[in-house]
Amino acid sequence: MKIRNACAVLIEVLLFILEGVTGARKISTFSGPGSWPCNPKCDGRTYNPSEECCVHDTILPFKRINLCGPSCTYRPCFELCCPESYSPKKKFIVKLKVHGERSHCSSSPISRNCKSNKIFHGEDIEDNQLSLRKKSGDQP
């Protein structure tokens, strides 16, 4: 029994050395823009899923910030901007997108209510060069 185990170990070591010398095993790397194993596409264009997303046939960076109503922001790669009411005073809710599923306002979990929480991510707004309106009482 010990001889069989020793032979198996010896064979494995020899195969390992042989692979290193001859380069028999090729390891593929995914460093180029068109070399992703599944080549995710958005409207026919390939994109990098570790840095970008596809929303309505448009490639967006993960840092992208959009307005949800007049006073709230959301990240379209990770969240949905959903109308809560269609009255003249429209109310909006930000909902989370569920990874791996097609997200809809009717079935996604609520992240926050835009009317009660005015959340602005300063660094994200600066990255996207969004401008904020000054309060009406502020002087220039």
From Swiss-Prot:
Subcellular location: Secreted
Family: Belongs to the IGFL family.
Induction of the gene: Up-regulated by Imiquimod. Up-regulated in skin upon tissue inflammation and injury.
Signal peptide: 1-24
Its job: Probable ligand of the IGFLR1 cell membrane receptor.
Keyword field contains Disulfide bond: yes
UniProt note on tissues of expression: Highly expressed in skin. Also detected in colon, thymus, mammary gland, lymph node and lung.
InterPro entries for the chain: IGFL
Subunit structure and binding partners: Homodimer; disulfide-linked.
Pfam families membership: IGFL
Cellular component terms (Gene Ontology): extracellular space
Name the UniProt record assigns to this protein: Insulin growth factor-like family member
Keyword Magnesium included in the entry's annotation: no
Keywords: Disulfide bond, Secreted, Signal
PANTHER family tied to this protein: INSULIN GROWTH FACTOR-LIKE FAMILY MEMBER 3 (PTHR34827:SF5), INSULIN GROWTH FACTOR-LIKE FAMILY MEMBER 3-RELATED (PTHR34827)
